[in-house]
Regions:
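Core SAM-dependent methyltransferase catalytic element
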Residues: 204-206, 224-243
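A short SAM/SAH-binding and catalytic strip from SAM-dependent methyltransferases
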Residues: 108-123
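Conserved class I S-adenosyl-L-methionine
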Residues: 1-41, 55-59, 80, 84, 139-176
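Short alpha-helix
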Residues: 188-211
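A short glycine-rich, Lys/Arg-flanked "PGG" loop and its adjoining helix->strand segment in the class I
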Residues: 123-138
């Protein structure tokens, strides 16, 4: 199923007001960890899968990438990306990630931010990205952590006073569809285990260079005290793999 909630006007309006939409990369809590894993962009060709507003595309060009292609299923997302981009070396393609097709060995770097957990077959994406990368090329991506996606509810257990007791994990080994809620809308995500992420990459031919589970920094907790609970369970998984 190729899901496109972002072209729904109400859903998009809510997404547009999220911190990661209004503040860009600095509004994404996992960005410092993802940024630290990114390879050298200078004179590199880059593909961004699930590019959204194009923040990572523009960052790659700021770091002197020679060309960048952003792919997204949402027309509204790409309309916003075009409005924010005035660089002929960045191009955007309106297409589901599942349907991408590029020549072998076209890209030096492929990046994806919080998109692959909306894709049914991670195995297929691994095979495609491996083929699209040049030898020595890098795949860097973030997804919602399997501990976060295991249950449909994707929420804490609370006591009668509304205090967060713990983050429940259930049906972890049962991969597949999770009917969950995001921005008050019903959204389909695909849960897979930590080992599936790793093994699908290895089976496609990738070498795993780094695996990160970002934590809320002291500064984040100081500015937003509720963020301390984010360190009670991982929300994101970030992986750097090399062809």
């Amino acid at each position: 199923m190729k899901q496109n909630k972002y072209d729904d006007s109400v859903f998009f309006s809510e997404y547009e007001n999220m911190p990661r939409s209004t503040k860009g990369l600095n509004g994404a809590g996992e960005w410092p960890v993802l940024k630290a894993l990114l390879p050298e962009f200078k004179n590199k060709s880059v593909l961004d899968l699930g590019c959204g507003f194009g923040w990572h595309c523009r960052y790659a060009r700021e770091q002197q990438a020679c060309s960048v292609i952003g792919v997204d299923i949402s027309e509204k997302m790409l309309q916003k990306a075009h409005e924010m981009t005035s660089d002929p070396s960045i191009s955007y393609i309106n297409m589901p990630i599942e349907d991408i097709n590029f020549p072998d060995s076209q890209f030096d770097i492929i990046i994806s931010s919080l998109a692959f957990h909306y894709i049914k077959s991670f195995e297929a994406i691994c095979k495609k990205t491996y083929r699209f990368l040049k030898p020595g090329g890098s795949l860097v991506f973030s997804v919602e952590h399997p501990i976060f996606t295991s249950r449909n509810e994707q929420d804490w257990y609370y006591d009668s006073q509304g205090n967060r007791l713990h983050w429940p994990v259930d049906n972890y080994q049962t991969e597949g569809v999770r009917n969950t809620t995001f921005l008050t809308e019903n959204v389909i995500k695909y849960h897979r285990t930590f080992s599936t992420y790793i093994n699908d990459l290895i089976h496609a031919g990738f070498k795993i260079n780094a695996v990160k589970e970002p934590m809320a920094t002291e500064e984040m907790v100081k500015n937003v005290p509720e963020m301390k609970d984010e360190n009670r369970r991982p929300m994101f998984l970030i992986i750097l793999a090399e062809k």
